[in-house]
């Protein structure tokens, strides 16, 4: 742990189209090599595809629901006690919760088979709103690990 002062959180401006801060953060997660325009095109393209597939659904609302569904409540951390490593379940802080859900959505979309990244992302977001998809599978896996190691929860950090 650093002993210096705590680093202040940078204020992230909301995205230009929807005025949503979470969407802006997700844009930064999707961005690679500083190419923000490409990330913006991918995300807005995915939201447009969601709008076309489900005209009754608000694409921004679908995005928020998907992010909230993928957020993990608990995760496991390794803790060494008496020469043995234990996987200790710990509650996830809200900031990390959001970061993990965005990262998992990105990774799950990458692994999909559709042609463009916008299509992959749109389908992954739609599946996440319904509680399916690669990102949801990842969250459930993390929750299962925490549940299986509940016996070691007294080794709190």
Swiss-Prot record:
Keywords: Ribonucleoprotein, Ribosomal protein, RNA-binding, rRNA-binding, tRNA-binding. GO terms for molecular function: rRNA binding; structural constituent of ribosome; tRNA binding. One of its GO terms (biological process) is translation. GO terms for cellular component: small ribosomal subunit. Disulfide bonds: none annotated. InterPro entries: Ribosomal_uS7 (IPR000235), Ribosomal_uS7_bac/org-type (IPR005717), Ribosomal_uS7_CS (IPR020606), Ribosomal_uS7_dom (IPR023798), Ribosomal_uS7_dom_sf (IPR036823). PANTHER family: RIBOSOMAL PROTEIN S7. Belongs to the universal ribosomal protein uS7 family. HAMAP family: Ribosomal_uS7_B. Part of the 30S ribosomal subunit. Contacts proteins S9 and S11. One of the primary rRNA binding proteins, it binds directly to 16S rRNA where it nucleates assembly of the head domain of the 30S subunit. Is located at the subunit interface close to the decoding center, probably blocks exit of the E-site tRNA. This is Small ribosomal subunit protein uS7. It comes from Delftia acidovorans (strain DSM 14801 / SPH-1).
């Amino acid at each position: 742990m650093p002993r210096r002062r705590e680093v202040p959180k940078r204020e992230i401006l909301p995205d230009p189209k929807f005025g949503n801060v979470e969407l802006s953060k997700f844009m930064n997660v999707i961005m690679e090599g500083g190419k923000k325009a490409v990330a913006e095109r991918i995300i807005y393209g995915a939201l447009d595809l969601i709008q076309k597939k489900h005209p009754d659904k608000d694409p921004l609302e679908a995005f928020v629901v998907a992010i909230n569904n993928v957020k993990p409540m608990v995760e496991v951390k390794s803790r060494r006690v008496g020469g043995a490593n234990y996987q200790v379940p710990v509650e996830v802080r809200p900031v990390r919760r959001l970061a993990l859900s965005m990262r998992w959505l990105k990774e799950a979309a990458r692994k999909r088979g559709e042609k463009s990244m916008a299509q992959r992302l749109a389908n992954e977001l739609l599946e996440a709103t319904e509680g399916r998809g690669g990102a949801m599978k990842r969250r459930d896996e993390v929750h299962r690990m925490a549940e299986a190691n509940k016996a070691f929860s007294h080794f709190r950090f």
